[in-house]
Amino acid sequence: VRITRRLPVAFLGLTLALTACGTDASEPEDAEEATTETASADCGAPEAPADRAPIGDGTFPVTVTDALGEVTVEEAPERIVSLSPSNTESLFAIGAGDQVEAVDEFSDHPEEAPTTDLSGFIPNVEAISEYDPDLVILSDSAIDTAEQLVAVDIPTLVLPGATDLEDVYAQTRLLGEVTGNTEEADTEADRIETEFNEVVEAACAELGDTVLTFYQELDETLFSATSATFVGQIYDAFGLRNIADQAADGESGGYPQLSTEFVVEENPDLIFVSYGDESTIEAIAERPAFDTVAAVENDAVHLLDADIASRWGPRVVDFAELVGEAVKESAGR
């Protein structure tokens, strides 16, 4: 596959600035901060934009826009290396699994994904090139690696983390365009959107005018995610009010560290935990004064699968179902 790339002038300036500052990227699977600042507390599925771009017809060459600018893919790839778990899941969901040669160490879903020891955190150009890829798909946290791959003529597609659900649908369709699976990708994007909306509307019907408060706990040190993040917007669709939005550093990257005192004072109705196991739920209940927190009192501390709660691929519906069930349980009390 031959890919040509055109960088926008604005991005060239940004790249130089980042290089000069010595900025390092963070984890590749962190979804980018969204522009939405606070939860709306209105329960309901998001409306589709009127200007949604149509998907291509599946022919090559095809030109798309990634995090680095315009990319032209001359022909359908046959040896894809995916270093992003979210994109790996999407590739298989749209029928491009047979075109995937290798995936990174954390791309563990679906089972048939050819998981290797390739790192998505610190990608190694030499290790990647050993798979003789005709397309490498990277997170935008690995821009330096992407530029190195392009420099040695390895076709590369750099996709940013989703900031909202519309990004999920758009990236699903984009992957369909660059792999030649446009019809399957369009069908999959429609499925995700339809099923997500159905889950939300079912929960909203039971919730009525009730507004529940919550926070998602990312680790035992009480780091959380605000409504300005991708995962925060999933909860926002259910009309939940995120107490993390009120945290002192809630506007600092969208991932504030809460204190036990803050949580007790805010008294959330629901707590979602995306790490650990059932013993973690017990440990949370034993924290000082947490026995007075509504979520603990009402057995409304819910354990989430960490992968499902952080990836923006086809399993975003599974994430919604977990949240929806928790909302319906609390609404019935």
Where is each model-derived feature located?
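Proline-aspartate-enriched helix->loop->beta-strand connector
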Residues: 77, 124-138, 154, 259-273
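Alpha-helical, coiled-coil/dimerization segments enriched in small aliphatic residues
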Residues: 107-108, 224-254
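Structured C-terminal subdomain patch of bacterial secreted/periplasmic proteins
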Residues: 144, 167, 173-176, 186, ...
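Bacterial Sec-exported substrate-binding components of ABC uptake systems
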Residues: 2-83, 183-215, 326-333
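A short, structured surface patch at a secondary-structure boundary
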Residues: 56, 63, 79-131, 135-141, ...
